């Protein structure tokens, strides 16, 4: 091709690619492969460059699909790569830059081709292209070696066994990307795939023994957040005279195949977004989430989920039960630190949810931490900026809070952690507040946001469940948190009255002659009354279990006591209103006895004195409020599209045409 190519769109005319995809068979020992693999470029990462690369690859693939049944060149390319991977570890130890660089380039080419093949071909056709036999040109045999499976196992071994050095960083990222590409057939199906070659290869056969090692490696990649090496340390720098070892390796190397990618150096500027400091960590986390969320194969549970559900702390010396497969140990302190630091991304929040929900060892460890604020504050910040987040990220953050609030120790300890100057909380200056009070404020704000915008019942339910779990352990509530609890009840009360009025008017008014259906006011009323009932139960739970710890809540209750009047005789709320009514009456009479024109400080003093005198036996006992998160049936219908949307939006150096995506709606968040 020479040095004239300057655009990715020229790739289909490239002589090396034309030969690879052409009608001539190329032997595995042909010097051609060294020429093909000897390119150096800043890998394209901007969507425009990646789109151009995809379009250019399609053209090459069309020719390859047509000719490969006769040439077997795809199999030859794969075998050359496989032979190189067997020497990769030794090459890394010997600092054999050239060998690693060429092996990376071979994998890059395979990955580009495989991505198009997976989209364009059926699984059967894909397998046929990888099962060519030289003995009988032009024919395929089911008895021949399964190169596709061998390729996948080779990628797994490359990820787990190759030491991570400056010179191996890029090939490690590329191997993980290639595995993501291998599993990407899910993107092109509306339905969740329950049987595929990926299930077959990854859940049985030679890949299976590497399960725990792969999961552990991907987790440690996430934990370590290794940054890519500085430019020039992983690829040979260009010699000033155009000579040197690199350029003497094969004819036309320096001005050959892939110089098109330099685009005058612009390619290097289109790096990952500034917040993505570790492509390896990002790609590892995405692959891990894809693997963990694969559906179980028939009669074979997902081994990657088993591994994630059972690993233990390196400091835990107790033996693993023999019945648990794919076990390993990892440093929980390092994992916890990484989880705390990385919660700005959807994928890190999803990993935290997965570990808390599925791994009891991790959950126990997290709940025992004395620096819980390091984990909870980033989660609260996600919820606080709800309008900037997608709904899935908000759900994950809320469910994490719900799981944490299932633990009484957590609910007690968060009120003992005092925070100062929460800069991201802008509604009010909070110079000093407990973590528990801040959590209440943020959850209530989320409910109010949901009431005015999305009106999502599922979101309401999770918010209220978390507050309910905490309510018996409310301690020393900040005055603003106490006010917001009552303010939320006020908002719900107004909404209830408005819906009730609309329902009454619709019954009185004439029947609508238009085709527009009337709103279901009965349904709306039922939902709002359910939420009001829940709020009353939360207030009641606090009053009956920790009244003496919360004078600010009693103060807020008395200040807005008129709000509760309409619910005293309401059949849906009569029982739960008894205690609230008793507390309001008891303290109201004490304030009346103290006279008028009382200061805030004096009112609080009267409340604190009255708490001691209030006869506790007069408060009716209710069952303790306890809600537990239970994953819905067929959770894969939610999680698999979500995970792949994260891959689509966040994977480094991977582009798919949005028009080809079937799994999720491209216009959704």
Swiss-Prot record:
<keyword id="KW-0519">Myristate</keyword>
<protein>
    <recommendedName>
        <fullName>Dymeclin</fullName>
    </recommendedName>
</protein>
<comment type="similarity">
    <text>Belongs to the dymeclin family.</text>
</comment>
<feature type="lipid moiety-binding region" description="N-myristoyl glycine">
    <location>
        <position position="2"/>
    </location>
</feature>
<dbReference type="InterPro" id="IPR019142">
    <property type="entry name" value="Dymeclin"/>
</dbReference>
<dbReference type="InterPro" id="IPR016024">
    <property type="entry name" value="ARM-type_fold"/>
</dbReference>
<dbReference type="GO" id="GO:0060348">
    <property type="term" value="P:bone development"/>
</dbReference>
<dbReference type="GO" id="GO:0005737">
    <property type="term" value="C:cytoplasm"/>
</dbReference>
<keyword id="KW-0449">Lipoprotein</keyword>
<comment type="subunit">
    <text>Interacts with GOLM1 and PPIB.</text>
</comment>
<dbReference type="GO" id="GO:0016020">
    <property type="term" value="C:membrane"/>
</dbReference>
<comment type="function">
    <text>Necessary for correct organization of Golgi apparatus. Involved in bone development.</text>
</comment>
<dbReference type="GO" id="GO:0005794">
    <property type="term" value="C:Golgi apparatus"/>
</dbReference>
<keyword id="KW-0963">Cytoplasm</keyword>
<keyword id="KW-0472">Membrane</keyword>
<dbReference type="Pfam" id="PF09742">
    <property type="entry name" value="Dymeclin"/>
</dbReference>
<dbReference type="GO" id="GO:0007030">
    <property type="term" value="P:Golgi organization"/>
</dbReference>
<keyword id="KW-0333">Golgi apparatus</keyword>
